[in-house]
Amino acid sequence: MGKRFIFILMACSLLSIATVVHAQHIDKQTYTFAIKKADTLKLDKYVMIDQIQGTQSKPVILFTFGGGFKGGRRDNPDYISYFHFLARAGYVVVSTDYRTQLKDIDKSEYSDLQGFSSALQQAITCAVEDFGDATNYIIEHSVEWQINPAQIIACGSSAGAITALQAEYEICNQTAFADRLPANFNYAGVISFSGAICANGIPKWIMSPCPLMLFHGDADSTVPFTKAVVEEMGLWGSNFICMQLKEKETAYYFYIAEGIGHSLSYSPMKDNRHDILSFLNRLVLGKEKRYITTVEKNPEISRYKSDFTIEDYIRENMR
């Protein structure tokens, strides 16, 4: 009798463990959302398996990769654990392709300031258009995927962060990009890992943006922490954006790492996951109006370069 009881107990325990493992399994599906000449654009959807059977609509994280508009992958292995973390937290995660317009351009064509400025603007415009098409695809499948189209959060790393921020900037200024999306659509929030906004002259916001979470190192020589301007065209980084958000009294979470370079384009996906969840739960889903700034200081870093020129940024991005 005792042996039988122990056997039953062990069987129940194994069944319980198997149930937990099954519940935590992440389902991944891949879809083609656009074909543009030679480019077939796809997106990957990640959702926790036990949520597929639910009836409640879920918020979405729409992620776009980094790579200097020259390369990068939506399924970069370094991103996957971040996607799974968010999926287990109750989000549907969508990682999307976009056309990387700088990959086939001869570097000699944008080695000077004007050439670089023009090529970069074209690459950003192209990436943002594709990001909008991915957004539309999600909205069109919102019922089938059981997601809430009013709770789509844009997220990106480096070039992807520029793309996500630029998309929000275009919506707020009611440009032609906004016409590609449903009327009155806006993202519920934006999470930017070392991003910036591209604008001719100082950025102006006709409408206030959604809550923004900005990660940036003040020693970043790839994407400007504050700004990099060529005549009128400029890249306006997280620090400048945050100053504007303060003036507009718009909710934000700004994470500054002093003495740190472009590693903030990926490290928060591992090191700041719970900060990200706090932003999502409070400022995005909870609609709390908060102005949060966190400054990370490393006492071992006392002297570092942060006053980069536009030539420095071009040199770094041509590697």
Give names to the regions the model predicted.
Residues 136-208:
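Primarily recognizes the serine-hydrolase "nucleophile elbow" in alpha/beta-hydrolase
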Residues 74-96, 103-105:
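Short amphipathic alpha-helix adjacent to the substrate-entry channel of hydrolases
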Residues 68-71, 93, 137:
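Serine-hydrolase catalytic-loop signature spanning alpha/beta hydrolases and amidase-signature enzymes
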Residues 113-144, 237:
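Alpha/beta-hydrolase active-site loop
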Residues 178-249:
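The feature captures the conserved acid-bearing segment of alpha/beta-hydrolase catalytic domains
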Residues 23-56:
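N-terminal cap/lid segment of alpha/beta-hydrolase-fold proteins
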Residues 56-68:
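Short beta-strand element of the alpha/beta-hydrolase
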Residues 246-319:
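C-terminal catalytic histidine-bearing segment of alpha/beta-hydrolase fold enzymes
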